[in-house]
Amino acid sequence: MSVNIRPERLVAVLAISVAVAGLLLPFKVPAATPVDTTPQAVTIPSLPYPQSGLRKRLASMGKPVPPVDESLQDDIPGQYFPPQNDDAKNIGQHPAVVALPDCDGSFPDDWVRILQSHGMGVLLISPNEAHPSQAYCSEGSLEAPKHGLTYWAFDAISALHYLVGMDGIDPERVAIFGYGYGAGAAQLAIYRKGHAKHFDHHFRTLVGLRPQCMSEMDNFVPSLLIGLKDDPFNPPAWCHWRMDRDLLPGRSNVSFEVIESGEIIEKQATRRTLSVESSAVIVTMVTEFLSKMGMAGDSTRN
């Protein structure tokens, strides 16, 4: 006995069969798009040096103003490390950090990776290469004074403006992370009465690891400083003294934590990074602070 099936019913049966077969096949997850985290060599243009209030007053009175010595101003070499977090890259704009090294140009590799893994781009700049005549790890003299902090802070502000102009970076979420001597310069880059007041863009917050607290702490944004107990290069006592001295009305909060390094004094008396600098305690402290400041992404890989 033959059965006549209408063409439209046959099409419907075939469609249902294909759908059921598809459900029985193993589900394939689309392959994740690989993230290129290779550092990119960049050159950061130095911003025009701001005119001080004194120079403006002299000019307004018609008095001669001596030229500014810009011989040590130069473009700043750097490396940009993109964030590792896929989501942070795909939502359009991600936070970024300007990283300032110690006076010998060193910056902990672990911290570049940690910041990347939390969805932040990292711009590591090299002020030493921009100003080779300034030997920052050595002491200056009356004949040849060292003004490294000022130059480094200005380099950091130039790097901030460079990042603000980059595609994919949120201009309102650029922080500064200083290490050792670089942390001292970073503090000067957020000083309310310093260079930063002359420019439109400001850092969102500051992190200083093993900071040399030689700069003013009258900050316009919150900061977290983490020192090591008995650190011979960057004594925590300097930071305590600065914090007490610069406790002025309107200053943003400065948090200062001192951590036991667990190292003998001989190992601390070097410019090499110490294992405690990227320990779970310090990583948690920093990433929670950055998250509170609106910086950290959703990734928790470190």
Regions found by a protein language model. Name each.
Residues 32-91:
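N-terminal cap/lid segment of alpha/beta-hydrolase-fold proteins
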Residues 91-102:
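Short beta-strand element of the alpha/beta-hydrolase
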Residues 107-109, 114-117, 126-151, 266-271:
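Cap/lid segment of the alpha/beta-hydrolase catalytic domain
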Residues 143-166:
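Alpha/beta-hydrolase active-site loop
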Residues 178-186:
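Gly/Ala-rich beta-loop-alpha elbow adjacent to hydrolase catalytic centers
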Residues 191-203:
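Conserved hydrolase catalytic core segment
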Residues 200, 204-255:
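The feature captures the conserved acid-bearing segment of alpha/beta-hydrolase catalytic domains
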Residues 251-302:
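C-terminal catalytic histidine-bearing segment of alpha/beta-hydrolase fold enzymes
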